[in-house]
From Swiss-Prot:
Entry keyword annotation includes Translocase: no
GO term, biological process aspect, one: response to stress
Keyword Nucleotide-binding recorded: no
Molecular functions per Gene Ontology: DNA binding; DNA-binding transcription factor activity
Sorted UniProt keywords: Activator, DNA-binding, Repressor, Transcription, Transcription regulation
PANTHER family assigned: TRANSCRIPTIONAL REGULATOR SLYA, TRANSCRIPTIONAL REGULATOR, MARR FAMILY
Free-text function comment from the UniProt entry: Transcription regulator that can specifically activate or repress expression of target genes.
UniProt-listed NCBIfam families: PRK03573.1
Protein known as: Transcriptional regulator SlyA
Gene: slyA
Signal peptide residue numbers: none
Residues annotated as domain HTH marR-type: 2-135
Subunit structure, as described in the record: Homodimer.
Amino acid sequence: MESPLGSDLARLVRIWRALIDHRLKPLKLTQTHWITLHNICQLPPEQSQIQLAKAIGIEQPSLVRTLDQLEEKSLIIRHTCLNDRRAKRIKLTDNARPVINEVNRVISITRNEIFNGISNEETIFLNKIISKLEKNIINLHNKN
């Protein structure tokens, strides 16, 4: 019987995030917090809440509570978009820099440790397969 690849990949992501979560405990950030901060850094500056929610893969209402909490921690500020008063733009504060640097450091170290013993060629091959799977899934979504 074949291994359920989707379940295997989901489990891999879950335990990978749990490891990072454990290592970031001293920062007193929940998994949702550090994932949100990490995604804010990956996007161009002052993205809208809608764009951030899409990048993370969640609905915007689900993101609002997390952003409220990050704002309470003085890690982000939100302001109304000049072009669309309904939209909110997200900006990192100066307080967020050291936190994000530590989050990114832990993520990078953890990734390197996880990939220990895996060659660069194997990593490139894995990335190609993941990209193909993602493309196929997106194409299937677009058909429906």
